[in-house]
């Protein structure tokens, strides 16, 4: 299996490098195409009207590419630019920090994986729900061991690992996306010369819906959430056709 590995933390991020080593040792053909610098929270943005520069880096089993663009750029370039063999799977991560609930819309990690889906390649996004993690090996091993069981299809699987030692994980839950609600989102500050500014911060409110990814990780479980790119509200679609007296063009 050819695996394209990318992220939004940058080419040299320990989560990505640990995942590369783990998957390569498991016998997979792994290729890295990742941003050349930190690109967190860039969502699904792509680079227009600017060139994309790539820098080659030697890997134990081939060549990796650091790209001057966004995470989605990396996946587009890898697949549509044919700088690596066509992948059978895109894996984005391991991210430094969680990608849970509605935060996936801001996530460069999840968006890179979704770009693979849009280009016809199954994808996985992997995040470790800690901003101070130093050991990504348990998360990487979980991914490697889970690959044969995930029944990869045309969509995306979003995996979040709890911020706990592996022996303290309570298990695995298959979940739906929660709604990340933040408290105290903006801090009002003053710059040295007196100019006011705002610093985006905030903490996520505790989740109470036990079916969600937020709740699972909050309680110490690994969360696995299947996702797809179709954002259509089919209930509203039907209601609007009826209320506007429009016939279904597909009938």
Swiss-Prot record:
GO terms assigned for molecular function: 3'-nucleotidase activity; 5'-nucleotidase activity; exopolyphosphatase activity; metal ion binding; nucleotide binding
Gene Ontology cellular-component annotations: cytoplasm
Signal peptide: none
Note describing how the cofactor binds: Binds 1 divalent metal cation per subunit.
Compartments it resides in: Cytoplasm
First-level EC class: hydrolase
Recorded family membership: Belongs to the SurE nucleotidase family.
The protein, known as: 5'-nucleotidase SurE
Source organism of the structure: Desulfitobacterium hafniense (strain Y51)
Species classification: Bacteria, Bacillati, Bacillota, Clostridia, Eubacteriales
Gene: surE
């Amino acid at each position: 299996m050819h695996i394209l590995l990318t992220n939004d933390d940058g080419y040299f991020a320990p989560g990505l490098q640990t995942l590369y080593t783990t998957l390569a040792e498991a016998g997979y053909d792994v290729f890295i195409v990742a941003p050349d610098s930190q690109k967190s929270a860039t969502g699904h943005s792509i680079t227009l009207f600017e060139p994309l520069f790539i820098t080659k880096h030697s890997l134990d089993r081939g060549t990796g590419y650091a790209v001057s663009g966004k995470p989605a750029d990396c996946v587009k370039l890898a697949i549509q630019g044919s700088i690596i063999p066509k992948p059978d799977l895109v894996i984005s991560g391991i991210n430094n920090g969680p990608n849970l609930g509605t935060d996936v819309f801001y996530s460069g990690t999840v968006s890179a994986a979704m770009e693979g889906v849009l280009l016809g390649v199954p994808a996985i996004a992997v995040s470790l729900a800690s901003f101070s993690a130093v050991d990504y090996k348990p998360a990487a091993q979980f991914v490697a061991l889970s690959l044969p069981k995930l029944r990869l299809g045309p969509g995306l699987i979003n995996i979040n690992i709890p911020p706990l030692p592996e022996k303290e994980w309570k298990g695995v839950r298959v979940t739906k996306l929660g709604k990340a609600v933040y408290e105290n989102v903006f801090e009002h500050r003053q710059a040295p010369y007196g100019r006011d500014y705002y610093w985006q911060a905030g903490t996520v409110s505790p989740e109470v819906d036990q079916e969600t990814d937020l709740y699972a990780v909050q309680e110490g479980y690994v969360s696995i959430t299947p996702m797809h790119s179709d954002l259509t509200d089919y209930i509203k679609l039907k209601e609007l056709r009826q209320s506007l007296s429009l016939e279904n063009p597909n009938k």
